[in-house]
Swiss-Prot record:
This is 3-dehydroquinate dehydratase. One of its GO terms (molecular function) is 3-dehydroquinate dehydratase activity. Its EC number is 4.2.1.10. Homododecamer.
Amino acid sequence: MRVLVLHGPNLNLLGRRETGIYGNETLADIDARLQELASELGVDLECFQSNSEAALIERLHGAPGTVDAVVFNPAGFTHYSIALRDAVAAVGLPVVEVHLTNIHAREEFRHRSVIAPVAAGQISGFGTAGYLLGLRAAVELVSRGKMSRA
């Protein structure tokens, strides 16, 4: 089984940016923890980060036939990127949306995700552990043959 982890904009600044909100772990730390869990689960993992909406869309478009599921933190694009929403809907793979913080407990403009309605599920508010939960969820969805929304 192969899983793609997509990290959206500004996540490359984790560990330096708003540490009171996002914590001290870096993106490299998160990727290392994900790789460790993936090894335990027998999963081949690819991690990709971009600040570019177009690059994230291109990687999603390339996912079918190369991966079985996607764990995706769309970050700031969560709330308004119809293009990413449409890409998630188009790929025909289980996509688990993850967020470090509880987007529903933050500023009102962060409460709405345009990605969630086309994702298999959403995990938010558990910090970096949310990525690990997202990977476990993706593996479970693939194992059960779930392609998209329940």
